[in-house]
Amino acid sequence: MLGAVKMEGHEPSDWSSYYAEPEGYSSVSNMNASLGMNGMNTYMSMSAAAMGSGSGNMSAGSMNMSSYVGAGMSPSLAGMSPGAGAMAGMSGSAGAAGVAGMGPHLSPSLSPLGGQAAGAMGGLAPYANMNSMSPMYGQAGLSRARDPKTYRRSYTHAKPPYSYISLITMAIQQSPNKMLTLSEIYQWIMDLFPFYRQNQQRWQNSIRHSLSFNDFLKVPRAPDKPGKGSFWTLHPDSGNMFENGCYLRRQKRFKCENELALKEAAGAGSGGGKKTAPGTQASQVQLGEAAGSASETPAGTESPHSSASPCQEHKRGGLSELKGTPASALSPPEPAPSPGQQQQAAAHLLGPPHHPGLPPEAHLKPEHHYAFNHPFSINNLMSSEQQHHHSHHHHQPHKMDLKTYEQVMHYPGGYGSPMPGSLAMGPVTNKAGLDASPLAADTSYYQGVYSRPIMNSS
């Protein structure tokens, strides 16, 4: 400390003998021009803590050296701690190199400590840089913490992720009588979602447009319930309109049935000249299909097409009725197969591409039939209560098919294993055969064309 005080008492002209190169002044002045007050203040507090925790040699060396560097700085930094601005602006490597380069130009008493001082200062430089940037990061953190509050404040007024059909369905299902007037639907939506309290004319037009779909029915007022406007209720067949009760995604099965009913009605009116209603015709087709499958298929057995969805059974029955052919022509009778007969049936399906007992277009149907009966489809994920409700709309054999298919799907062996006992694996075996037949045919074809197998690249 005494040496430092003596050196600081020298005249400025004496310092020129210690700094032979003028670059030292230019580099320090450039650094001083680019420094800020915050970085120096943080470095001063940090350097004091570091010097207090360091050893005696290092703190003495750094103090002496900082006095030299501080004496060579511009007058604007003379009142601050020596060397604070110069070392705060340097990075780790640049600070170490700069201090090591200045070491030989210092006094002889400080030249042995040049390397040590460079190491100490170089290690502290990154922390000084980080602390000098900390006010900026703090402001950014405060601004980020402030944003979610405003976002959370306006989130309740955001548009809900439901379609208008979903909103109408929710309102009707949560009413005690399962029917609401148009004004009651409006009021329920506005009470639950504040977003719809604005621009009422726009979304109310969309609500009226959505009520015109086939999913909703208009119920006239009874004489004992006077008032204005008719009631609106859900279609009886649209009870499972949304997948697993989730109103974000709508199921396509009911939409498919509506389109097919309209197509069948148009085809019957133009070609057959029948005057029955579309609903009656669809029920007759469904009853005929169920009776045919029940009479031809023994108990515990399923035909290849019996596990198709109701939508496609309507399509197959309607097309066969319009053409004048019985519905049983598309699904031949199949006795209860033994394991040997199952293997023969699988080998027979793998053989010729055209089955003699089936029309050519029947080979293409099972591919999209089974898309609706995927193990993870909504039909197989339905609860037992929904299956019981589903069986009321259809005939009794559909309930038997659902149960048998559920037993097949819960069998631990999966698709490919043979079924022991009397439980038949009719649809599963046929599905495996139909899925494997084009692959086997293509493999044999390409093996005949090329001299070696396709997958063998060697």
Curated annotation (Swiss-Prot):
Checking CDD domains in the record gives:
FH_FOXA2
Q: GO molecular function: any one?
A: DNA-binding transcription activator activity, RNA polymerase II-specific
Which intervals of this chain are the motif Nuclear localization signal?
Answer: 106-113
Summed up, the tissue specificity of this protein is:
Liver.
GO terms in the biological process aspect are:
adult locomotory behavior; anatomical structure formation involved in morphogenesis; anatomical structure morphogenesis; anterior/posterior pattern specification; cell development; cell differentiation; cell differentiation in hindbrain; cell fate specification
In-chain residues carrying the UniProt-annotated modification Phosphothreonine: T156, T301
Q: SMART domains in the record, alphabetically?
A: FH
UniProt effect for mutating L110A: Inhibits nuclear export
Which locations, inside or outside the cell, does it occupy? Nucleus; Cytoplasm
* Segments of this protein annotated with the region Disordered: 286-365
What protein name applies here?
Hepatocyte nuclear factor 3-beta
